Each structure stands twice: as structure tokens, then as C-alpha cells.
Amino acid sequence: MVGANDQTFEEVKPVLSHMGKNVIHCGDVGAGQIAKICNNLILGISMAAVAEGMALGAKLGIDPQALAGVVNTSSGRCWSSEICNPWPHINENAPASRGYQDGFATQLMLKDLGLAVEAAGQVKQPILLGGMVQQMYQQMCMRGNAHLDFSSIIQQYLPEQV
């Protein structure tokens, strides 16, 4: 996610390609930051949605592994369900399988959601889901879970089980 004029982008692209496999020119200066804010807004919302769905399925009695199998081969599939599923042991490499340690901290997701809500306010763009999810992550931080991976949002739904 890069914001720069065309000439500058072409000059720095070889260096940036050593830092990541996808180097996307988003527009002028600042456009990369806008893309990051929007991407993380979507990520925060999608993680909360996956957590909500997984929690509902568990409460209704379906095995979380079976539910994840359905979701990840169906229309609900996304990065949050497949790579970083908030239910422990769906993906052994996910932070949920390590006690929500060593991931993208909840406090960082809260910061990014705050940036998105602020930016939306500046251009008078409603982001209803973003505001709701921001409040959920804020509650997690207030409960002392700011350092946990943001997938720990599932604890808002099933604190006694995960």
C-alpha cells in the first residue's frame, strides 16, 4: 500500500518489493494510509463476524471444527475464518491456538478502528459496523486484554469457553 506520485513510486518500487511480495500503488501521498485504514476496518469487522458466527454455532451445539469446515468451503470464507480463526485449534498456527498470544494486538486494532471512525467523520461517511466493532475492541482493552491478539474478540461472546 503505497501513496506517492507515479515517478516516485517507480523509483522506490524495487526497494519496497524486498519488504513485501505485493506492492500496490494506491495513488498520491496519503493513499496508502487510506487503504490501510480501510483494509483494517474490514478486517476488524470480519473478525467480529466470524467470532459471532462461531460462538452462535457452538451455543447451538455444532462442533466448531465442523462449522469452520463448512464456513471455509462456503460463502462465509475469509482470512479471519480460515487463517486466523478465533476458535482455538481450528488452525494450529493461529493466535487462538496459542492463548491469543503473538498476533496483532487488540489495542492496535482499536487504534486502527479509531482512525477509520475519525476519517469517516471527517468526510461524513457513516460506518455503523465499524463504530460497533470499535466499541467491542475498546471493551476488550478495558478488561485488560489489550495485548491479546484481536481474534480474542470471541471472548465477548463466549468468555467461559475460549
Language-model features and meaning:
Residues 1-41:
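Rossmann-fold dinucleotide-binding core
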Residues 31-161:
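Helical "substrate-binding/catalytic lid" subdomain
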